[in-house]
Every structure is written in structure tokens, then in C-alpha cells.
């Protein structure tokens, strides 16, 4: 058995025996690692609260037969502290942790870009400069991009025709609190098309999750959503990190953006992200 050192974000923990825990960590150099923290649940544990979710830790581990064992842990930054008293930020953070684990199915497969995205997302939540749901959606979109699943937002996802809808500007779209606009599209991005003049489907574009993003009129599949032009502009801004544009977006476009992003990420994961249910009810 060999010793190795790495740093990582604690994603989750689960009980093992009477005093131990299995800790799932997204590390900088070794990808996702599952390791045992011996005696963590004891009152006088030498690890204290260092192996709790949201904590960035520097670790010394040795390789075990099935699970590695944590022999030393030092806190680099406890991202959970500023989130614990802010429910919207906490729920967005838990959705990030769950997503990070879902996008790292293989253990000990280095994925430093996913690690850095998670660190940046948690830092942004803790700094409380931006709307936590915007931070979450930016994280989800960039995580998709790193994994090779970025939605097509500038051209048709099917035929590649460049998008011209973004120059039209946007007016009121009447989106309701459930993320549905006048086209009746729900969180899964599907519904009857009754697009107004400010909506993508009113010109040449719609958004279809199964197709991979925007679709032109010729490639539009049944049930495609007709989001507001400003909603697609917001998605573009979040994907490229344009916070000046994202921060001035209107609430109804943020709701619609979140619905599309949630549907898109869960489609590509082929698995629901349970934490998103709590975010949607904030």
C-alpha cells in the first residue's frame, strides 16, 4: 500500500461502522476518490469537521484494497460556513456537489477542469456577489461544456445554420413563476408553441433538449420550447462568464433559463439531480 497526497472538495459522506465514514472527494490530481476517515464520528476525532461536505481539504491517503484510507486532513477553505445560514446558496451548493459527482463516474480518473469549476463555483457562492441560481446555472453550463455536452446556442444543433435570432431584442414574455411562458413550456422544455414576437420560436429558432440546443425552423422537433430571445442571451452570457450581462437579466428570463438548463443537464446525465428539486422551490 502506497501513500499519496492530494487536495480536493468533499462531495458527500456516509456512515461506516460505529465511528468511521466513507468520504467521497473530488481531487485535483486523482479525480473522484472514495476513502475511509477512521474515527471521524467520534467526539474527539482528530479530523474534527474537516471531512464535511463543501470543505476544501489537503489530504494524505494510503491506497487500500477497495477503499483508500485518510491518514491526515488539513482544511484549505471551508466553503460550507457562509452557505449554512443562506438557504438559496446552500441548496445551489448541494446541487453543484451532486452534479460534480454525477459527471465523474470513474474513480481516480484525473479531471482537473471539473475540479477547478467546482472550486470556482463554490467560491462564487460564498462571496455572495451574484444570484446563487445564476452561479449554479453558470456552473452547470460550463460543466456540460467541459464534458463535451455544451448546448448549441449560436447555431442550429442539427444542421449548424448560424443563429440570427439574438439580434432581435426581447420584450415581455409573460413567463410565470414555474418557468413556463405563453407557449406552455414546462421545466422539461416541452409544450405547445404559442410564441410571441420576443420568443425564439417566433422567428427561426426553438430550443430542443434532445436535439442539443437551438434548432432552426426546418429542424425543429415536435414539442420544442420557444424561450425568450433574452433567455438564450442569458444562457450565452453564463456560459462565457459575462456577469455584467447576467446580473442585469430579468427575473422571468432567469427562471426560464434555469428550467432549460436543469432539463438539459439531466437529459445528458440520464439521471435526475435530486438537489435541484430543492433549488426550484426556493
Question: Predicted segments — roles?
Answer:
Residues 1-282:
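Non-catalytic alpha-helical scaffolds and adjoining flexible linkers that form interface surfaces
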Amino acid at each position: 500500500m502506497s501513500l499519496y497526497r492530494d487536495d480536493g472538495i468533499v462531495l458527500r459522506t456516509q456512515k461506516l461502522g460505529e465511528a468511521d465514514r466513507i468520504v467521497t472527494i473530488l481531487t485535483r490530481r486523482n479525480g473522484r476518490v472514495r476513502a475511509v476517515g477512521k474515527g471521524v464520528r467520534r467526539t474527539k476525532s482528530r479530523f474534527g469537521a474537516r471531512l464535511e461536505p463543501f470543505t476544501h481539504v489537503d489530504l494524505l491517503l494510503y491506497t487500500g484494497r477497495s477503499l483508500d484510507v485518510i491518514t491526515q486532513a488539513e482544511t484549505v477553505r471551508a466553503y460550507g460556513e457562509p452557505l449554512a445560514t443562506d438557504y438559496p446558496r446552500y441548496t445551489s451548493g448541494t446541487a453543484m456537489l451532486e452534479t460534480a459527482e454525477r459527471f465523474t463516474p470513474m474513480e481516480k480518473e484525473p479531471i482537473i477542469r471539473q475540479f477547478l469549476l467546482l472550486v470556482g463555483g463554490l467560491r462564487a457562492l460564498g462571496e455572495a456577489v451574484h444570484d446563487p441560481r445564476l452561479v449554479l446555472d453558470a456552473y452547470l453550463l460550463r460543466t456540460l461544456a467541459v464534458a463535451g455536452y455544451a448546448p448549441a446556442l449560436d447555431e442550429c444543433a442539427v444542421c449548424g445554420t448560424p443563429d440570427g435570432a439574438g439580434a432581435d431584442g426581447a420584450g415581455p414574455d409573460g413567463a410565470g413563476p414555474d418557468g413556463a411562458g405563453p407557449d406552455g413550456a414546462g421545466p422539461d422544455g416541452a409544450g405547445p408553441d404559442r410564441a410571441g414576437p420576443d420568443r425564439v420560436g417566433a422567428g427561426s429558432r426553438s430550443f430542443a433538449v434532445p436535439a442539443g440546443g437551438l434548432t432552426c425552423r426546418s429542424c425543429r422537433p415536435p414539442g420544442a420550447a420557444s424561450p425568450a430571445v433574452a433567455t438564450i442571451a442569458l444562457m450565452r452570457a453564463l456560459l462565457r462568464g459575462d456577469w455584467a450581462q447576467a446580473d442585469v437579466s430579468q427575473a422571468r428570463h432567469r427562471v426560464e433559463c434555469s428550467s432549460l438548463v436543469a432539463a438539459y443537464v439531466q437529459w445528458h446525465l440520464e439521471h435526475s439531480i435530486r438537489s435541484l428539486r430543492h433549488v426550484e422551490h426556493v
